[in-house]
Amino acid sequence: MIRTKSAWFVVAWVAAGLIGCAAVDEAPTSNGRAPAAPEPVIAAQLAAPETRVAVVIPAATAPVIAPAEVAPVATSPQALDVVVQRAGTRLFNDALRALGNAPRDLVIDPFIDANTGQQTLAGVAAGGHLARLIAENFRPWTVRPFERKALAGNPLLLIGTLTPVALNEAGNGPPDAYRFWLTLVDLRSGRIVAKRLDRATLASVNAEPTPFFRDSPTWHMDRTTTAYIKSCQVEARVGERIDTLYQWRLPAAALLHEAIVAYQDQQFAQARRLFVQATDIADPDDLRVLGGRYLTSWRLGAKDDAAQELKRLVANGLAAGSLPLKVLFRPGSTVMLPGADLREQYRQWIREVARQASARQACLRIVGNVSRSTSATASVELSQRRAATVRWLLAQAAPTSGNRFTAQGAGWRDNLIGSGHDDQRDALDRRIEFRVVDCP
């Protein structure tokens, strides 16, 4: 078990400058926001269970791969399975040319949506497809589970993002394709070996989040997620080092992956133990830790523990200036989704936000968001009414602070997904945000 005072910390890689940038070949989705760059970190830690690891790769021995441009992407999107097969085959052939045929282990850090940081069912399917492709056609490599003990051998690391995008020139419409980035990293050097970019059709991508991310109460683009995305996408070129914060937090990412798998297998006690264990080595604002500790406490019926974890979640969001919560409503209405368990959680979330905002004497703007399933005008009106509903509940929970709470409707202007499905696939588009603002 890893603890703060007893973990074995190992210097494995040293960062070398800032990673370069290249022009993006397509526009982002309608929110148009790029994730903030994390602060550089120049050391990495690695802790495997009951194993002392001491791996230091001198800079002089690390193979240097000449920078290369990403090959042009196909002009029209194809079905996801076609895209994964094509991009994966090209990526792995590129890597074999760079590295040779020496046997290597390979791990896959689960793919994410670069707009939300969530893992989706389509991303899981793509990872499984590539693991089978390696086993069948790229025999020098052996796919290992993404766990701490596998990282001890400095394997090859495969990362990827699958993100909705608008391909029109202005980039301000609804998404009409998914952008698929694949990046292969050699952890012996910390450098990118190969990259590939492709596009998949909307209809072929199941964007429903996996159970852990579906159940998580909050969302924001934390530093660790941002570092993953920077390492995977256009900002980092072949031959360059991956983001140092991402590499530094790889042991935590592997431990959190084990915890998420346990949660999704409904092994809640095991999952909670792993989430607590990850607290010592993960970034302080990592929402997988904060959300995982809350969710597992709730699932185990430990309501007092869940309340304490909720306090940490809310405090983290308010300290950051924005706390998005997935307070979901029935499509087209201001009635919250039914279900005794869900509504009980909503009540606790809102009460805790009210309590902490009141204690801080903070002014909050409650911003409603809706899916892109109606006109712009109607979406603003509906999101305003939803925000007003939550503002009223906040004022009920903290009567003396009610005049410091205001409501605003954003419509679908700040959609992260933009599909307009009004279901779990675009649940984050219907979030309620509690933004800390200056008091009048």
Each model region followed by its residue ranges:
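C-terminal/domain-edge helix-coil "capping" segments
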Residues: A22-I65, E69-A102, L187-D280
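C-terminal motif of bacterial Sec signal peptides marking the signal peptidase cleavage site
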Residues: G17-G20
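Periplasmic OmpA-like peptidoglycan-binding domain that tethers envelope proteins to the cell wall
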Residues: G117-G127, A131-R132, D304, L337-A340, ...
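Short, surface-exposed beta-strand segments enriched in small/polar/acidic residues
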Residues: N101-G117, L323-S333, I350-A387, F405-G418
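A short, hydrophobic beta-strand-centered structural micro-motif
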Residues: L91, D105-P110, E136, R144-T183, ...
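Short, solvent-exposed beta-strand/turn patches at coil↔beta or beta↔helix junctions
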Residues: A66-V83, L318-E352, V370-T377
